[in-house]
């Protein structure tokens, strides 16, 4: 067969890549063509994404792809919840605002004065997080109502890139489900949520499934760059769901961790789980590929180490991630623990000092040097994963033979081993580039080269290496987990 060339554009919260995927009928080989930083810009006190620069970088990737021949298609995935507003002439009204901007502070409670919290969850099945799109829109209506009045269409970040690539103004299902405005059962915008919160339905586009063929790239872009028009595919726009498509799981029941800046921990289901327990535990039902539901929790992940490293660099200490991991591996275990999801750790800044303060206030020994701090973060993440695993088991009534860990976090052998130890479960780590492989494979699925999600995963398994970590020292980890639950689980973990 003829080889297929696809471009996977993958935006993370700190960097972006344009990757070439080549499919020979059995395997996908990937090659990085272009990598670039994705740094927010603070202007007049508001934190923005630099969308124009990011679109420029996509174009650079397209230019670099020319030497590899015709590109059959392109797909874009990004982080969730953020969006751009388009006016009636099709112009971007302003750069998209970053989810870490402070504008949503207090919006969660304000929403409950307009809509019953239980009813809100019953409809959306979504984890309540102040960063969610719905709360960003509430903040916009309160603080800048004129901007929303001028908007003709809201486009989530991957949809925004797709629009400027090919002209389609639609909302892909997986990224739409991060808004907390979607009915989890009907997979459509919830009129009740929108009306209760006063959000205008007119700005929301039609929802299309993952794998929708949106059309050819605009002639103007192709002429500018000197390229042939490739097809734009709406892959799973939320990077988590593109990564999940690439989990090489053979069992129907499996746990996944998409481990990057955020750790998304969950399982794949055919139908949403929405009940009193899932609401109490704040577990979300996110839309996936081919109508699947990802029943998961968003956990602050490697952000804690990334932001700590940035602080140490500001202090003149240039540590690589590998060096930090080795230092942590040599540090004494279980000196102090934190809840990675504590509100104090959400904003950028001096994370090491905030960790010390949390440990001091909770009566624990305070981590001193960098090694102890990184060890504290890794152990705390592993215990948070165990707690979430127990919660998901309670909600689904199922047992899971293994944890599939994908993404950049799999490069930390220490975190993978700690996760296996804490969870009493083998960890199958890899692929590292799950999001890119999933993005590319979903383009092949849309083109008819692959038949279904099972075949997507089989191709990924043939294309990437995995490592297996068996649990060790489980008795010691169990003892400390009991202490962790008492400190950080609701009701002291009595429900677990």
Annotate each PLM feature:
Residues 101:
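Carbohydrate-associated surface elements
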Residues 70-78, 153, 206, 398-407:
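Short glycine-rich phosphate-binding loop at a beta-alpha junction
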Residues 38-44, 119-120, 170-177, 200-203, ...:
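Gly-rich Lys/Arg/Thr-decorated short loops/hinges at beta-loop-alpha junctions or inter-strand turns
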Residues 77-80, 210-211, 259-262, 402-410:
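Glycine-rich beta-strand-to-loop/alpha-helix junction loops that act as flexible
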Residues 63-98, 127-131, 158, 162-183, ...:
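Short beta-strand-loop/turn "lid" adjacent to the catalytic site in phosphate-handling enzymes
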Residues 1-94, 122, 150, 222-232, ...:
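N-terminal glycine/serine-rich phosphate-binding loop of ATP-dependent small-molecule kinases
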Residues 2, 7-8, 20, 112-124, ...:
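Active-site core segments that coordinate phosphate-bearing ligands/cofactors
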Residues 47-55, 126, 130, 207-211, ...:
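Short acidic-aromatic active-site loops that bind/stabilize oxyanions
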């Amino acid at each position: 067969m003829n080889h297929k060339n696809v471009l996977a554009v993958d935006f993370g919260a700190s960097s972006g890549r344009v990757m070439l995927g080549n499919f020979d009928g059995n395997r996908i080989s990937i090659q990085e063509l272009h990598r670039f930083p994705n740094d927010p810009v603070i202007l007049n006190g508001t934190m923005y994404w630099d969308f124009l620069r990011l679109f420029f970088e996509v174009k650079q990737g397209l230019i670099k792809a020319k030497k590899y021949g015709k590109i059959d298609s392109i797909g874009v995935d990004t982080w969730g919840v953020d969006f751009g507003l388009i006016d009636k002439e099709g112009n971007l009204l302003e750069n998209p605002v970053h989810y870490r901007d402070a504008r949503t502070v207090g919006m969660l409670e304000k929403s409950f004065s307009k809509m019953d919290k239980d009813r809100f969850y019953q409809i959306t099945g979504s984890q309540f997080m102040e960063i969610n799109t719905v709360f960003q829109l509430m903040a916009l209506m309160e603080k800048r109502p004129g901007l929303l009045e001028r908007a003709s269409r809201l486009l989530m970040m991957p949809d925004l890139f797709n629009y400027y690539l090919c002209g389609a103004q639609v909302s892909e299902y997986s990224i739409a489900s991060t808004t907390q405005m979607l009915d989890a059962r009907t997979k459509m915008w919830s009129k009740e949520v929108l009306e209760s919160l006063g959000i205008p339905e007119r700005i929301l586009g039609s929802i299309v499934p993952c794998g929708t063929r949106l059309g050819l790239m605009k002639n103007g872009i192709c002429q500018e760059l000197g390229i042939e028009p490739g097809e734009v595919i709406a892959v799973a726009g939320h990077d988590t769901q593109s990564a999940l498509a690439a989990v090489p799981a053979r069992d129907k029941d499996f746990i996944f961790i998409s481990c990057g800046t955020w750790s998304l921990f969950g399982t794949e289901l055919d139908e949403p789980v929405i009940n009193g327990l899932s609401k109490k535990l704040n577990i979300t039902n996110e839309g996936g590929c081919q109508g699947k539901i990802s029943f998961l929790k968003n956990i602050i992940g490697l952000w804690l180490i990334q932001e700590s490293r940035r602080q140490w660099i500001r202090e003149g200490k240039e540590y690589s991630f590998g060096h930090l991991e080795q230092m942590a591996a040599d540090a004494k275990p279980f000196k102090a623990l934190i809840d990675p999801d504590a509100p104090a750790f959400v904003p950028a800044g001096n994370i090491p000092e905030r960790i010390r303060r949390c440990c001091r206030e909770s009566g624990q020994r305070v981590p001193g040097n960098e090694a102890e701090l990184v060890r504290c973060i890794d152990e705390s993440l592993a215990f948070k994963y165990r707690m979430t695993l127990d919660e998901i088991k309670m909600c689904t009534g199922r047992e899971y033979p293994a944890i599939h860990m994908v993404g950049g976090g799999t490069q930390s052998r220490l975190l993978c081993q700690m996760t296996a130890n804490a969870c009493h479960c083998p960890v199958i780590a890899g692929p590292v580039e799950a999001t890119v492989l999933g993005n590319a494979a979903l383009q092949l699925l849309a083109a008819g080269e692959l038949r279904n999600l099972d075949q997507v995963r089989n191709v990924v398994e043939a294309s990437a290496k995995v490592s297996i970590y068996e649990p060790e020292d489980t008795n010691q980890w169990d003892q400390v987990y009991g202490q962790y639950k008492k400190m950080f689980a609701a009701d002291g973990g009595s429900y677990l």
